[in-house]
């Protein structure tokens, strides 16, 4: 068996799979090592991918040449585009996935990736010499050497699970924790944190009264995650269901609070603010008499259902008593209880934007070990870490994404610049340039970068350039075409809109919120002919992208100017220029933060909490700007 590799990836969750796949496809001999090979890319919590801002990350991963979008599309049992009622910057794709099919699809991807090897074992130590990582040692007593290591251990570092008073060591139910790594890195100067997450009980759908639920079906249109055509699920589609808690449920939960590990001191670590447990909800929102819950299928053929919104670490008897006060769940049977898990993580400000450690060369960290929460956030980090591990091995240029280029760029910049004091989840509100970071144009933003690296294929690159050309042609046609009033007025009046008094450019006509290209084409045979000339499989995608470009042109152009101005500060290098402890013109807090984080650029420095605009102005003066 081979024992020497270019890159070793520790942990085969969502971050690890993307990291290993990227490094191997770029040409590095890569070892992916995991505690249980039957649980590669396991969805430890909800059986879904995407959602608000998270869906944009998945599309960015796909555009760069990563795999999560493809795997998700192939295992999907329901797809929806969230936030349709808002502007396109907020549209976020989400897929309900078959949990087991998701694992099988990832396993196929990994096993068919050249240069990628897998091994089932637990890593206990890194081999570090002279501040450089050289490999790993395992629980079986084996040593594997490498030029780079990516740590993607998820919730497994000294993981401890809680169901009421019962505490069980583990990174996930039935899987042991990973020990030794935290202690070694702490001794090397890594700042260690402790965080908590949780998961709800799983229910038997045969014991649910669906007549008491609100049905929620998926959408049957052209949207999906991968930009590659023909990537789709062969699985039957399934609905989700909505139910609500009530005061009886809350009363049971309140009586159980003294037994809750969250409220009796058993759990002391910090949980995710935006995914609170049900006991946290009834305490934090004490005035609310009801909370919405989603009953989500775990797969196409299983009876197991996931109760989204009811994460809990209460004793099981309290959980089930509370559930049975929900009308649809009066006779419910459960397959497994909800539980909480505590785990170790590290301060991400001790990383560079490539996710390489500042303390140990060629050691990269990605995923929940950096204090994030969510499959998508982990996968995005894993992709960047895997790319840069390969770049380090081969002497290539570091690969990073700016805040105005990708949500992945926002995510990593937030982590390494601001750090985390609670599990970090991505939202559209975190991206100041979100109108430029839409889900529909991730390929046009990033595929050329992925192709330049060698990660995105020529097929993917040519599809992107063909799409761009078709959009440009359709936009040009809209600008050049004048629509006669008598040709369009019958359609306008039939749809309750003000008729034209004279001809108007098609481009300007499209600015009306009620109008879209497909509707106008019903009255204009020439426009219909333009649409018929587009490849049928991509026509809806081209139309949607064209409408966004036309209707939101002013916003996009304005935001581009703002982003360009901000980017100038990111082009002013700070690294190695100052001993911040000696700059007494800036505030004490700024000195301490700048010394600790050592930002690469003035732009990054300006985003550090505690560094004021006046501090930045002083730095610019000292730089001679």
Predicted regions and their residues:
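Core beta-strand elements of the Rossmann-like FAD/NAD(P) dinucleotide-binding domain
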Residues: 3-5, 139-148
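Short hydrophobic core segments
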Residues: 10, 143-154
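Conserved N-terminal/central alpha/beta ligand/cofactor-binding core
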Residues: 21-125, 140, 152-169, 176, ...
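An anion/pyrophosphate-binding glycine-rich loop and adjacent beta-alpha core
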Residues: 36-38, 54, 182-320, 417-490, ...
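Conserved beta-strand-loop-beta-strand element in the redox core of flavoprotein oxidoreductases
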Residues: 127-143
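A glycine-rich dinucleotide-binding beta-alpha-beta segment and adjacent secondary-structure elements
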Residues: 306-372, 400-413, 539-593, 598
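Extended, charge-enriched "interface" segments that sit outside catalytic cores
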Residues: 430, 436, 447-617, 621-624
